[in-house]
């Protein structure tokens, strides 16, 4: 499929000529093609005569970006640039990563996904349909004899997009956005990645009734046919790209867990919503434990939102508690998990399999007041009874952490750790400024969405964002460098400890996590620790002597390479 290759010396060779060169985003330099390249590649007359540098182009691109009237327009602009000139896109993103990450990734990508069919301009990645299994085979056949050309595949079925639910084929945009972060943060070569949407239909009524919708316009397929679709995808992906890391993104809760369970011990794969969210949350909790001077093993955790993300966080924290010396039984008893029906208890009907280990004994909570909707035990009552030291929100219920709940928690904890993790900002369980005021500046806060610093009593509180981008780029890079056969639980803990080790929580108002602007440094640090752990745990198939150098050598940078005609 590819009509170009990158040589060992770093330059690019291509068989394409003229307008064909300009149509390939990885090759296109626009007016930065040199005179020699213009002549050799047949570009004379197809470009204005002046040759500019990538610095000039980046300056102009930022002016154009800044002129866009709103965040969605900025996303559309960056998408168009990505589809036109990939190197310039990443140069711009690297120059303004903190500013642009919320545009190419959460939260703005959610709006872009909702508008996908109406803003559609150009395909990118693979669109694999459950209604066309032969078409899926044909798509992978296009990569015949190119088994070493792809290091990373991000796939979604788009049933559980961010906090907005089922958005069908438009979910390809989350795969694309995720890969953009991999490249911007960790230098994963953009020519060696692949975005995939697994279109099994949609249950979103607005899409089913939209004549412009470009995906399968029928209800979501479930059961054996869906499972076979996933199995066929994995088999084809592994057969075609045997060394590729398979990243699962934004599947529905039930499928996300079953797919991960089916494959985690067989292929190099992970689910970012479950394991990535868990790892970045563990990093925040490790920082909170250090700041509060209370050992991790002595904390009590309430999780409000017992879905894929919430239980994923619980699992990462619980495994860390076991490694700190608690028994399996003791570790489960450190968690109180709440869903829409209230505190999970073992007498509840319709508990999901992954929720059952975290359900409290009905006898244990018999004296709790059942004042929630439907007779359940609500968050306030759980906080009163459990006296948590850590409160985590993954519910997408805006304002769920009320003043009464927060003050109740703060009345029995010197430094309450409060993590409203839901995205986007409008769905956050609480605002940092309120949490700081209600706790008189004592709260240790980490949020899922970006929030500005808060001034209180002469102290500036910087709010750490528990963005999965702190985890998955470095995890991917470390995995690729070592060509790991699997991704282990130990590799995720290595991510968390590396991230937590990069902040100085002793400074008043310090964030519990590194800044998003420092993602490049964070990702390199995480990659080194992941690689070390992969080698230690015996899943690495390549073991570089100098891991730091190997990680640096593997990182792609957005600079124009010489292009030669062949």
Curated annotation (Swiss-Prot):
The active site is at 105 (proton donor), 178 (proton acceptor). One of its GO terms (biological process) is pyruvate metabolic process. Its EC number is 1.1.1.38. Disruption phenotype: Mutant can use either a gluconeogenic carbon source or glucose as efficiently as the wild-type strain. The ATP concentrations in the mutant grown in minimal medium with glucose are similar to the wild-type level. ATP concentrations decrease by about 10% in malate minimal medium. The mleA-maeA-malS triple mutant shows a decrease in ATP concentrations by about 20% and a moderate growth defect. NADPH overproduction is roughly halved in the deletion mutant. Divalent metal cations. Gene3D superfamilies: Malic enzyme, N-terminal domain, NAD(P)-binding Rossmann-like Domain. A divalent metal cation binds at residues 249-250, 273. Induction: Weakly expressed in glucose or malate minimal medium. The keyword Secreted does not apply. NAD(+) binds at residues 306-309, 423, 468. Keywords: Magnesium, Manganese, Metal-binding, NAD, Oxidoreductase. GO terms for molecular function: malate dehydrogenase (decarboxylating) (NAD+) activity; malic enzyme activity; metal ion binding; NAD binding; oxaloacetate decarboxylase activity. It is an enzyme of class 1 (oxidoreductase). Disulfide bonds: none annotated. The keyword Membrane does not apply. It catalyses: (S)-malate + NAD(+) = pyruvate + CO2 + NADH; oxaloacetate + H(+) = pyruvate + CO2. Its cofactor is Mg(2+); Mn(2+). Catalyzes the decarboxylation of malate to pyruvate. Can use NAD and NADP, but with a strong preference for NAD. Can also catalyze the decarboxylation of oxaloacetate. Involved in keeping the ATP levels high. NCBIfam families: PRK13529.1 (NF010052). Belongs to the malic enzymes family. This is NAD-dependent malic enzyme 3. It comes from Bacillus subtilis (strain 168).
